[in-house]
Amino acid sequence: MKKIIATLTAILAMGFSSSFAGTLVINTDLTDPAPKAAFEWAFNKFQEENPDVTIEVNNFDHEGYKQAIRNFLTTSPPDVFNWYAGNRMLPFVRAGLVEDVSDIWSDTGWVDGNLTEGMSHAKKPMTIGGKQWGIPYTYYQWGV
């Protein structure tokens, strides 16, 4: 849990400076209790440290999100959203709906001092055409 919270805090802090003010829109389907609590803690901490930024969270149920993402990315894209890596994100990358975040992967000042080393196992699924299109925030083991 501590690693998730540190990761979330770092992700929210990336790309924001004291000159940024306004609303940060986040679309997600993280409704499970532990991740939801970690995100809420990180959002509250971020807002304490950035009073000029308001976080607007649009939380969808898991199945509804799978349909909604196709609509909101083309009509009213959020600043931040979560999705699957690899082939699941490929259509959105090809359509130009996802921002290249390779610069964050090459930054050595993230959480444990080196995102590339600390999350090297997640880099390949996030890489399309030699660029990274996402930042991992958690890890789920789906099989044994």
Where are these regions (language model features)?
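Positively charged n-region of N-terminal signal peptides that target proteins for export
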Residues: 1-4
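Bacterial N-terminal signal peptides
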Residues: 8-15
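Sec/Tat signal peptide C-region and signal peptidase I cleavage site
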Residues: 16-21
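Short, well-ordered beta-strand elements
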Residues: 22-32, 53-58, 80, 133
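Short, polar/charged alpha-helical segment
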Residues: 32-54
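Short helix-initiation/N-cap motifs at beta->coil->alpha
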Residues: 59-68
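Alpha-to-beta junction loops
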Residues: 72-83
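Hinge/lid segment of periplasmic solute-binding proteins
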Residues: 87-142
